[in-house]
Design a protein with these regions (language model features):
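N-terminal pre-catalytic segment of deacetylase/amide-hydrolase enzymes
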Residues: 2-62, 68-83, 98-104, 195, ...
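Structural recognition of the beta-strand scaffold that forms the well-ordered cores
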Residues: 59-62, 87-91, 112-117, 150-154, ...
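Catalytic domains of cell-wall/extracellular-matrix polysaccharide-remodeling enzymes
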Residues: 72-75, 97, 121-232, 236
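Residues at alpha-helix termini
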Residues: 82, 108, 144, 172-173, ...
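Residue-level "edge-of-site" marker
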Residues: 93, 119, 155, 183-184, ...
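Extended, compositionally biased repeat/scaffold regions that form elongated interaction surfaces
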Residues: 244-462
Length: 462
């Protein structure tokens, strides 16, 4: 059935078909990666007309849908499932509102949801406020179903997809991926399968993003099995939208962690320069993956990721991560190590805490969190004459003159009662050590001795 909405859609689409074919032939990829100085949010949405890595002989299948017909969603999902393909579905907000069961089925099958505006207007004719309204109303429809597009957008009619103003408006709202396409099969015009397959043969390129339409009057659904078979006959495999916007070491790491099914979830940005040449970062729903030449790619997420970002991420004293977030041997906490000799440790009781430098080295020599000090409960702070970090079982003090030394137990209690580093004892110059009948710690201004029989702590001069 042809409706007025179908006619409007076809009129708008006709303007973009020739451009789509040209892009496929010339090999346009995406807008240049937007440099995010010091790991900052992108200033403009990245536009993907092909996958981020155009080398592999793979393609991504996507389908668009508006409100006027639901399309044969069960059949499309069955075809994709039978072929092991994860596709992208760009849906308008009014489609989501009218056909919630179909949208839930698409999401439950693991396919990528993409915000296609609320009611399919041309975006270059809208003000910033009107664009925001289109995005918000559509996303609200997804959220009422407990779903999200995670900041992915596809421009209706392909209108303004390369426009700097549109891209800036998207980025200002956290919609950092504009997921475009390489070529349109034109099944929405009701063309025979032979026409669709001819376009597949002519315009498919490595990394290509194939656009089809889900509407009931589109011939794409009927042609879908033949499209898949034709692509495979041409030597192409299939990737999914999630991995198609990643590349290189970050892409491999994301895939190795489980891609969208991992703690990272959906990609939120394209790969960006993290600080300078030879560095990269990509943001995801649940965290970020950083890469630096010679260090490799590592993820940071959750409370540790939030703390890392709050410290200044890779421009902070920590630098780049050199591990993924890793569980501690006792199973209680988690940690990331970083390139400049620092770590962030987290437990439910302590939160995410920073430990670094000579204090970290002392803590490590004493067994990390498995030693008597346990987990850090505070960050390193300045004290009289030096620096200190507090742990569950004691404290470590440092100065350039004295080095790093621990103080714990009853001796620490007496030390703090006498003013700690600000008192007459000053900074420690030894760890606690065994003496006849007890234990002792030495300080710049004297010593403290614990009696193993009485439990008393006495003090003396140097």
């Amino acid at each position: 059935m042809t409706t007025a909405a179908t006619v409007r859609s076809r009129a708008g689409r006709a303007l973009t078909v020739a451009l789509g074919a040209l892009l496929a032939v010339t090999g346009a990829l995406l807008t240049a990666p937007v440099a995010a100085a010091d790991d900052a949010p992108p200033a403009r949405a990245a536009v993907f007309t092909r996958g981020a890595d155009p080398g592999p002989r793979v393609v991504t299948l996507t389908l668009d849908a508006d409100w006027y017909t639901p399309g044969d969603v069960p059949r499309v999902l069955q075809i994709l499932r039978d072929n092991g393909i994860t596709a992208g579905f760009a849906l308008t907000g009014r489609y989501v509102e009218r056909y919630p069961d179909q949208v839930r089925a698409i999401a439950a099958a693991g396919h990528k949801l993409i915000n296609h505006s609320y009611d399919h207007p041309a975006f270059t004719g809208l003000t910033t406020a009107q664009r925001a309204d289109q995005l918000d109303r559509a996303e609200a429809a997804f959220r009422r179903l407990g779903l999200t597009t995670a900041g992915w957008f596809r421009a209706p009619y392909r209108d303004g997809y390369l426009d700097d103003g549109v891209r800036a408006d998207l980025a200002a709202r956290g919609d950092w991926i504009s997921y475009d396409w390489t070529f349109d099969t034109t099944g929405y015009l009701g063309v025979p399968s032979e026409v669709i397959l001819d376009r597949v043969r002519r315009y498919t390129v490595p990394g290509g993003i194939v656009l089809m339409h889900l509407s009931s009057d589109s011939t794409d659904t009927a042609a879908l099995p033949a499209v898949i078979a034709t692509l495979r006959g041409m030597g192409y495999g299939f990737t999914d939208p999630y991995r198609s916007v990643t590349r290189g070491a970050i892409g491999w790491h994301y895939a190795g962690l489980g891609a969208q099914r991992s703690v990272l979830g959906d990609p939120r940005t394209a790969e960006m320069v993290a600080t300078t040449a030879g560095t990269a970062v990509q943001w995801f729903e649940g965290g970020r993956v950083y890469w630096r030449d010679a260090l490799g790619a590592h993820e940071v997420h959750g409370a540790i990721g939030a703390r890392f970002a709050g410290l200044g991420s890779v421009t902070s004293l920590l630098g780049f991560p050199v591990t993924d977030e890793t569980p501690t041997p006792d199973g209680t906490g988690r940690f990331n190590h970083f390139e400049h000799g620092g770590s962030l440790y987290w437990t439910p009781a302590t939160g995410a805490r920073l430990v670094y430098g000579a204090i970290r080295a002392k803590w490590a020599s004493l067994g990390w969190e498995r030693g008597f000090l346990g987990y850090p409960v505070g960050d390193e702070v300045g004290v009289t004459g030096g620096r200190a970090s507090q742990f569950q079982g004691g404290s470590v003090y440092w100065s350039a003159a004295t080095g790093a030394h621990e103080v714990h137990g009853a001796i620490l209690g007496r030390y703090l009662a006498q003013g700690g580093t600000a008192g007459r004892l000053g900074l420690p110059v030894s760890d606690e050590y065994t003496v006849p009948g007890g234990r002792r710690s030495d300080f710049r201004g004297g010593w403290l001795r614990w009696d193993a029989v009485t439990g008393a702590v006495t003090t003396g001069n140097p």
